[in-house]
Amino acid sequence: VIAVIVILLSRNNPSSVAKRYVQAFYTDDKTATSLWAFDFNAIRLSEYDGSEEEFFEAMSDEYSADISSWNDFYKAVDSSFQEQLEDEYGEYKVTTEVTRTKDISVKKALEDCAVWVKILERDINFDTDSISDACVVTAKAKITGEDEIERTKIDVYVVKIGGSWGVLDYISAD
């Protein structure tokens, strides 16, 4: 029981959330989506008046796939992104590491992410008052391909809402 609690606590901290998000960004859209501090699929649906049916139809066209569920959508996104990465790098591997975690005020997080926060407030009624803590986590992603290596540094803004940490926004730090 104690081991389970330790594992759960170590996965629900800003560094872990940011690292898992950056890794999932390249490899697993379902996981990346689950790590946002808000309902990211609601943002996706906001352009379609909340209609999953219209969204899935549009995504079926965009990805040339039969998409009728979120799992179908995640698979199509992952497949498309993997194909793009393979075209650019050949066989590749993605690794991530956290290089810095800095506590910041909620006010600073909201200021730094102001454009995105306004969209969230407008489109999904995101309540910034529910944020109780904030950090900015710098993570490095490395794509090692057959012929080249690409490195990217990303500042991930992670906020605490209702006891859980989630991604508010990310900004390239290169």
Positions of predicted regions on the chain:
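Short beta-strand edge/turn micro-motifs at domain boundaries
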Residues: 147-174
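Hydrophobic aliphatic residue packing
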Residues: 14-18, 137, 167
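Amphipathic alpha-helical recognition patches that constitute DNA-binding helices
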Residues: 13, 33, 153
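Solenoid-repeat scaffolds in large eukaryotic assemblies
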Residues: 29-36
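Surface-exposed, charged secondary-structure patches
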Residues: 51-148
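Short, low-complexity N-terminal intrinsically disordered segments enriched in polar/charged residues
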Residues: 1-27, 39-58
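Short, exposed beta-strand/loop patches in secreted or surface proteins that constitute
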Residues: 25, 128, 158
